[in-house]
Amino acid sequence: MPSGRGDDADSTGNALRRLPHVRKRIGKRKHLDIYRRLLRVFPSFVALNRLLGGLFPPELQKYRRRLFIEVRLSRRIPDCVLVFLPPDSGSRGIVYCYVIEFKTTYSDADDQSVRWHATHSLQYAEGLRQLKGALVDFDFLRLPRGGGQVWSVVPSLVFFQQKADRPSFYRAFRSGRFDLCTDSVLDYLGRRQDESVAHLLAATRRRLLRTARGKRAALPRARASAVAGGRGGDNARRGLARGRAHGPGAQTVSASGAQGSGSQGADLLRGSRRARVRGGGAVEPAVRARRRTVAADAATTTVSSAFFVPRDRRGRSFCRPTRSL
């Protein structure tokens, strides 16, 4: 015949599983929101303790901290494991480890509701069972012959209302003391974190780091524009100085335009000289004829732009333009 304690545990689990799926989804989202906020405030002991309702004593403010989320132990998966290491790395002082279970509720929980409220009391009983299993898992990590560091494992329950930023109720239970190898246990907790949650939290951590770096490296727009304007003015002044260096009548042109025109003129001069030397003067009439053609075209353009000459459909002019005296 099964024991009454096992029947109570089964009935508690069945009752919580019968909750509406909407409430379960909201509870999962609230858990992820709590994890993100834990990462956000983790560097500050005051903000971290405020988020959890003052769960930690002030003496732990000087301790070094390690945070683990949803660690898969042999029996249970606690929502959060917070480890407080002694301030000195070589110290053999006590390590305080808080194993925390988060419970999300539709209404605020308190000391009375966890006893008499139907859902709150079931969540409270389930949390106690989960924390007890976590203590058994830490007992399996105990060194058989001692010689390790003393760990004080504190099981804790924290109730959050689903729309609240701070817990409505928390309770820390009697701690258990274990002789553990600190480095091995920390490595074990880090490797046993849930992978999907670890990736999500890693992305959140990278985003927080980028935001912090962006705030430090940001330059005001007014200052940036002033710097850019100063650089542009310097470049313009340098260009004017270069133009003045070539002479009083020099004009400011772009470097590419000056280089292109200079190279074209040099090529034309070289070509005409080479043709004149190689041809022995035979090309001179052709060069003169080309110059006359260019001059005639220029004169025609000047006359046509100065006078309006009416023409018929075939392009023949009705009258000839008179020459100016």
Curated annotation (Swiss-Prot):
Pfam families per record: Herpes_UL24
Alphabetical list of InterPro entries matching this protein: Herpes_UL24 (IPR002580)
Function according to Swiss-Prot or TrEMBL: May participate in nuclear egress of viral particles. Plays a role in the dispersal of several host nucleolar proteins including NCL/nucleolin and NPM1. Since deletion of host NCL/nucleolin negatively impact on nuclear egress, UL76 supposedly acts on this process through its effect on host nucleoli. Induces cell cycle arrest in host cells at the G2/M phase following by apoptosis. The mechanism involves the inhibition of host mitotic complex cyclinB/CDK1.
Compartments where located: Virion; Host nucleus; Host nucleus, Host nucleolus
UniProt entry tagged with the keyword Magnesium: no
Organism lineage: Viruses, Duplodnaviria, Heunggongvirae, Peploviricota, Herviviricetes
Residues in coiled coil: none
Keywords tagged on the record: Host G2/M cell cycle arrest by virus, Host nucleus, Host-virus interaction, Late protein, Modulation of host cell cycle by virus, Virion
UniProt name for this protein: Protein UL76
Disordered: region residues: 222-284
Expression induction or repression: Expressed late in the infection cycle.
Keyword Electron transport recorded: no
Main location: virion
Biased composition (Low complexity): 247-258
Family note: Belongs to the herpesviridae UL24 family.
Listed GO biological process terms: symbiont-mediated arrest of host cell cycle during G2/M transition
GO cellular component terms, semicolon-separated: host cell nucleolus; virion component
